[in-house]
């Protein structure tokens, strides 16, 4: 079965799941890693396009304390163009009024190629500390030279971001899930990308293609700073709320500490994100 990408699994998980409960202030912090429960805003992009402040309040009421945005330039056609109308202070006020924080956002690789300086300027102006691309955008069947060129380019981008006090990051979708010379391109990239300039953000749903989060966190200690969280049922091969399905979340979060994960973002259809909060709030890891 093909990898369930962000766009794919959002289309597959729109059936109703019990809505999340409103949580009191003291219940909003997740026990796993002692971090706030975060969510990616991609699943609620249509809501954001209509009402950004209201959407953030909905997420906060569901129990999310932090969010990860998508760039208004690289994701302009996906509902985020409207973010550009806000002055930095106004956007920060909207976040504060909703009761959520934001230090991370996704950016398109083409956006960075076209004008990384402008992207860094926007990120810095709203207080971001992490800039992540979903994929390096290489060919489906790359040669080793293709992979090396992509890594060299992204190392340079990481160096430029670092000068602005921002950590560049790489998600794992599409190109990263290809193979090159009989090896996983993703694994090859760990050897080519500078550990100081580029950190990794793991997409847990890539278990559908055999990419195990706990395995990667263990094999590449300190190379990660984030993860996107989805539940997964091996029986139905479908995305499910966190805590349901077949994933061992204690193992994932325990090894995430080894991997270096500093934040995580639930990313599924809104009802599933809401339904994931109670489990994450109660989950204990050693």
Model-flagged regions — what are they?
Residues 13-15, 19-20, 73, 94-199, ...:
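Active-site acidic/histidine proton-transfer and metal-coordination neighborhood
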């Amino acid at each position: 079965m093909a990898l369930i990408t962000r766009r794919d699994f959002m289309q597959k998980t729109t059936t109703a799941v019990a809505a999340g409960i409103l949580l009191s202030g003291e219940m909003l912090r997740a026990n796993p890693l002692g971090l706030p429960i975060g969510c990616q805003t991609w699943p609620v992009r249509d809501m954001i396009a209509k009402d950004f402040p209201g959407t953030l309040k909905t997420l906060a009421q569901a129990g999310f304390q932090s969010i990860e945005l998508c760039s208004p330039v690289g994701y302009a056609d996906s509902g985020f163009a409207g973010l550009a109308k806000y002055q930095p202070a106004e956007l920060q006020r909207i976040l504060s009024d909703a009761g959520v924080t934001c230090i991370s956002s996704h950016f398109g690789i083409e956006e960075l190629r076209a004008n990384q300086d402008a992207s860094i300027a926007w990120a810095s102006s709203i207080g971001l500390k992490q800039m992540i691309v979903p994929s390096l955008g290489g060919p489906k069947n790359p040669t080793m030279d293709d992979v090396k060129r992509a890594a060299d380019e992204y190392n340079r981008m990481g160096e430029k971001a670092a000068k602005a006090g921002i950590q560049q990051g790489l998600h794992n979708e599409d190109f990263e899930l290809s193979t090159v010379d009989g090896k996983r391109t993703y694994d090859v990239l760990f050897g080519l990308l500078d550990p100081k300039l580029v950190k990794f953000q793991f997409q847990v749903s890539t278990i559908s293609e055999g990419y195990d989060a706990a395995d990667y966190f263990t094999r590449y200690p300190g190379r990660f700073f984030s993860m996107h969280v989805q539940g997964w049922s091996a029986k139905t091969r479908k995305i499910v709320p966190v805590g349901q399905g077949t994933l061992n979340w204690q193992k994932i979060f325990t090894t995430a500490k080894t991997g270096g994960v500093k934040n995580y973002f639930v990313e599924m259809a809104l009802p599933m994100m809401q339904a994931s909060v109670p489990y994450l709030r109660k989950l204990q890891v050693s």
